[in-house]
């Protein structure tokens, strides 16, 4: 490993091997512990996209609130469908929800809000690129989740995991924003492993990962956007040797997007001071 890989592996907390039952139990217990430590929490809120990460996080959250209720705590899991108009993979969203069995499902079409925001910016002389409009969608989705959480005395659960965190492959204050991130510490293949253990439908964890935020590049695979495969990222996170080209790509993403992993800097926390 390179010196930087040593640092990253330690920071991202990915184990070389996991026991599915133990790892699931630890994540469920973390969610329960957080709720038990905050008396105001009566709901957990999460947007469900039909992809691996939200399906796994949603299932574990639902299992956690069911245990909490059995222990006498009033708490529910709210799954949120957040389409931008008509969602191309809407059937997979429904399949994920059928697997999760959330206590409540709320649907909010973000298209009117996003389109109006883009229009207002354009009228002010700010013409967003397609990529920037994609970030608008991600931030609107998170805004909606926090609004629901506020209304229902809840918190927002994030789907950030270590294979995503290392590359910064999320929108700052969009899908990167949340109160807790239960599946951090897992890489992509470990997330699939847990979904298999939880008996998720195979097509949900074998689905090609995509953020699907850009209108000009619908369903763009994550790996194409990143220039590196998840297997390579996972190997890197497990401390394995990978090609120098893949290593450089991953480390460039890590360094470039360091700001996404930090809260707003102050003059006391900025390392250059």
Swiss-Prot record:
CDD domains per record: NAD_synthase
InterPro entries referenced in this protein's UniProt entry, alphabetically: NAD/GMP_synthase, NAD_synthase, NH(3)-dep_NAD(+)_synth, Rossmann-like_a/b/a_fold
Enzyme Commission code(s) on record: 6.3.1.5
Binding-site list for Mg(2+): 53, 164
Lineage top rank: taxon: Bacteria
GO aspect biological process, one term: NAD biosynthetic process
Protein residues bound to ATP: 47-54, 159, 188, 210
Pfam family of the protein (one): NAD_synthase
Keywords: ATP-binding, Ligase, Magnesium, Metal-binding, NAD, Nucleotide-binding
GO cellular component, one term: cytoplasm
Listed pathway(s): Cofactor biosynthesis; NAD(+) biosynthesis; NAD(+) from deamido-NAD(+) (ammonia route): step 1/1
Gene Ontology molecular-function annotations: ATP binding; glutaminase activity; metal ion binding; NAD+ synthase (glutamine-hydrolyzing) activity; NAD+ synthase activity
Catalytic activity: deamido-NAD(+) + NH4(+) + ATP = AMP + diphosphate + NAD(+) + H(+)
Positions that bind deamido-NAD(+): 139, 172, 179, 259-260
Cross-referenced HAMAP family: NadE_ammonia_dep
Cited NCBIfam families: nadE, PRK00768.1
Subunit structure: Homodimer.
Role, per record: Catalyzes the ATP-dependent amidation of deamido-NAD to form NAD. Uses ammonia as a nitrogen source.
PANTHER family: NH 3 /GLUTAMINE-DEPENDENT NAD + SYNTHETASE, NH(3)-DEPENDENT NAD(+) SYNTHETASE
Family listed: Belongs to the NAD synthetase family.
Descriptive protein name: NH(3)-dependent NAD(+) synthetase
The species this protein was found in: Staphylococcus haemolyticus (strain JCSC1435)
